[in-house]
């Protein structure tokens, strides 16, 4: 997962590290922290493999608070660069929806994407809808400020 995340980030992907380049020293501790928080009821990592190799992965989390325990948050969807445009991301998101609904008993999913990357269109094709945006929230460089776009998938 670490190698995938490094490659995706350094290729300009919006997967959690906004300031490339990154290396193992940046990414490995974050992957370790994700793994440490895994819990069947609250946090899962779904992976896609092709021929035994990691093709992509995504994180699904549920908050511990009973107030919002009915919805999940999706983070870090990414595919290996060699498997781009082969439907891996879409397949991961379809499977994530099933896991959220059938295994974790979630009722809705939320995510936030970086504006200006075409991600809204990708998620919209999978049934997600935009619920709002934080204009100018993400400052990637002095001359590159983007909206953070909030999306929901409901019902599952």
What is each model feature region?
Residues 86, 90, 102, 115-133:
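Conserved active-site alpha-helix within GNAT-family acetyltransferase domains
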Residues 84, 109-120, 137-142:
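Conserved beta-strand-loop-alpha-helix junction that forms the acyl-donor binding cleft
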Residues 93, 100-113:
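Conserved GNAT acetyl-CoA-binding A-motif
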Residues 111, 129, 134-156:
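Terminal substrate-recognition subdomain of acyl/acetyltransferases
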Residues 3-76, 80-81, 93-95, 99, ...:
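Acetyl-CoA-dependent GNAT
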């Amino acid at each position: 997962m670490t190698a995938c995340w490094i490659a995706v980030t350094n290729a300009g992907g919006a997967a959690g590290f906004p300031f490339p380049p990154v290396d193992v020293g940046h990414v490995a501790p974050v992957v370790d922290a994700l793994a440490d928080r895994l819990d069947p009821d609250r946090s899962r990592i779904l992976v896609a493999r092709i021929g035994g190799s990691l093709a992509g992965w995504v994180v699904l989390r549920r908050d511990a608070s009973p107030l919002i325990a009915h919805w999940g948050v999706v983070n870090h969807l990414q595919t290996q660069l060699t498997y781009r445009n082969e439907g891996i991301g879409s397949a991961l998101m379809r499977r994530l929806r099933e896991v959220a609904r059938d295994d974790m008993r979630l009722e809705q999913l939320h995510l936030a994407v970086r504006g200006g990357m075409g991600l809204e269109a990708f998620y919209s094709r999978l049934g997600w809808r935009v619920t709002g945006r934080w204009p100018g929230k993400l400052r990637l460089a002095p001359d590159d400020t983007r909206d953070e776009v909030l999306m929901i998938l409901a019902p599952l």
